[in-house]
Amino acid sequence: KRSLGLTRGKNDELDAYKIAWFSYLFRDELSPSKMPTKTMFKLKSLMGERYRVVKAAATEKQVLKELFKQLDSKSIRRIKHRLKILTADIKAIEDEVKELVQSSPALKKNYELLISITGIGLVNATMMILCTNNFEGITNARAFACYCGVAPFEYSSGTSIRGKTRVSNLANKRMKTDLTNAARSAIVHDPEMRIYYKRKRAEGKEYGKVINAVKFKIITRAFAVIKRGTPFVKLRQAG
């Protein structure tokens, strides 16, 4: 609200002047951004559609679970019919996402590198590509961890305030949720991650902090395979 300082009145001309003035002051720190391609815009649209359909399916499943005994047979059949349609829609969208990714050599390469990591599937790989503009907009793991609310920050002031180190709420919440799902999957299917998780929990670390650490490990793996250009290889001695 007060980002322009103490100003009285507001109009487009004043706003344009302030933006131009600010840009001129920090011209040495500015770097040109690269617009996403048409393929990326289409990919974003498809993932948004998938998110909405998955949310609708989850609502129907919850209604069926909570009110199963109260609903009559006709209502149950209608809910199951809607779920069948929604499930088919999700598969159709995911198939279209795969086709779109395969149509672009650059997207295909990074996508296949990402899904070589245990815990990362279609959703996480595609969302990472979208959020980083195919790893051209965000190019390092720490910056991406900050973007999706995984990087911890210190909260302190002087000598009297010593708050806990915690993650920020200023984040891409959808990407953060997807990474949580990836972390849970990795703990189950990746021996190295499972050992790490159990060790940290045995040390008394909170569940949320350990899951967050696993998410960061997945992020670092993702950026490592993209940088190297080779698929992720599991450690044989783990497990």
Regions found by a protein language model. Give the residues of each.
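Short alpha-helical scaffolding segments that buttress acidic/His motifs in well-ordered protein cores
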Residues: 43, 128, 178-183, 214, ...
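Phosphate-backbone recognition surface of nucleic-acid-processing proteins
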Residues: 116, 122, 126-207
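Short, solvent-exposed helix-loop connector elements
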Residues: 4, 31-45, 68, 163-169, ...
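Short helix-capping/linker segments at secondary-structure and domain boundaries
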Residues: 26-31, 133-137, 185-192, 222-234
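Low-complexity, acidic/Ser/Thr- and charged residue-rich accessory regions of DNA metabolism proteins
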Residues: 159-163, 197-239
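Long, charge-rich intrinsically disordered scaffolds of nucleic-acid metabolism proteins
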Residues: 1-113
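Amphipathic alpha-helical interaction segments
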Residues: 18, 78-81, 85, 127, ...
